[in-house]
Amino acid sequence: MAVPRNRHSNARKNIRRSHHAKKACSGAVCNNCKQVFIPHTVCASCGFYKGKAVVTVEK
């Protein structure tokens, strides 16, 4: 079995994990209502997805 030879310091561990942070999600613009929404999801303001009405939104 693989066993670490020496202990890694907290600084070295944190430097290694510096790229593990969650990235901010880029927004896409809805073609129907021009609102910003999360890509690959239904627009929350109008209910359209890829140019088609998928969900009826109550206003």
UniProtKB/Swiss-Prot annotation:
Recorded GO CC terms: large ribosomal subunit
Q: Which Pfam families match?
A: Ribosomal_L32p (PF01783)
Q: Which SUPFAM superfamilies match?
A: Zn-binding ribosomal proteins (SSF57829)
Q: Name one GO biological process term.
A: translation
What are the UniProt keywords, alphabetically?
Ribonucleoprotein, Ribosomal protein
Residues covered by region (Disordered): 1-20
Q: Which GO terms describe its molecular function?
A: structural constituent of ribosome
For the keyword Aminoacyl-tRNA synthetase, the answer is no
> Which domain of life, per UniProt?
Bacteria
Matching entries from PANTHER family are given as: 50S RIBOSOMAL PROTEIN L32 (PTHR35534), LARGE RIBOSOMAL SUBUNIT PROTEIN BL32 (PTHR35534:SF1)
Assigned protein family: Belongs to the bacterial ribosomal protein bL32 family.
What is the designated name of this protein?
Large ribosomal subunit protein bL32
